[in-house]
């Protein structure tokens, strides 16, 4: 992904997250950083999101194992509930979609194996509300 396209996608996603009530920041680092830093991290309630962000005109994106590992390693540094996310802006359908990786491995993200970001927000909001209402 072209650096400017990547930066713009990351900024757009941070704006979307903030619009949904998350505290979100872009971490401008290179993939070569030895630190386990995601492209974006966001918090809401006791939930921490660690996000690898991509943008494409294609119908799929390959995310490398080391990119997934940095999401998981970043979350392991915190005690709050963490959710690793791969967020893809599929430009041909004008839609942000997300996938929650289960382990560090190469992953092909497609429109079919991911969910709309709005669905993720509904799931997370329900989880946050349940934690607030449950003593």
Curated annotation (Swiss-Prot):
Species: Saccharolobus solfataricus (strain ATCC 35092 / DSM 1617 / JCM 11322 / P2)
Binding site residues for Mg(2+): 10, 39, 52
Reaction(s) the record says it catalyses: Endonucleolytic cleavage at a junction such as a reciprocal single-stranded crossover between two homologous DNA duplexes (Holliday junction)
Entry note: cofactor: Binds 1 Mg(2+) ion per subunit.
Protein name as annotated: Crossover junction endodeoxyribonuclease Hje
Similarity section: Belongs to the Holliday junction resolvase Hjc family. Hje subfamily.
Pfam families: Hjc
General remark: A second Holliday junction resolving enzyme, Hjc, with different substrate specificity exists in this organism.
Record gene name: hje
Reported function: A structure-specific endonuclease that resolves Holliday junction (HJ) intermediates during genetic recombination. Acts only on 4-way DNA junctions in a sequence non-specific manner; introduces paired nicks in opposing strands 2 bases 3' of the point of strand exchange only on continuous strands of 4-way junction DNA. Cleaves both mobile and immobile junctions.
């Amino acid at each position: 992904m072209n650096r400017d396209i990547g930066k713009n996608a990351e900024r757009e996603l941070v704006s979307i997250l903030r619009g949904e009530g998350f505290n979100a920041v872009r971490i401008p680092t290179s993939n070569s950083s030895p630190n386990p830093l995601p492209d974006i991290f966001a918090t809401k309630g006791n939930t921490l999101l660690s996000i690898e962000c991509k943008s494409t005109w294609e119908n799929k994106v390959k995310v490398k194992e080391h990119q997934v590992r940095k999401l998981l390693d970043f979350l392991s540094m915190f005690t709050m509930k963490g959710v690793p996310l791969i967020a893809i802006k599929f430009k041909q359908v004008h839609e942000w979609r997300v996938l929650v990786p289960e382990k560090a491995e190469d992953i092909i993200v497609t429109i079919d194996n991911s969910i709309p970001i709005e669905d993720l927000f509904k799931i997370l909001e329900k989880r946050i509300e349940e934690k607030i209402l449950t003593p």
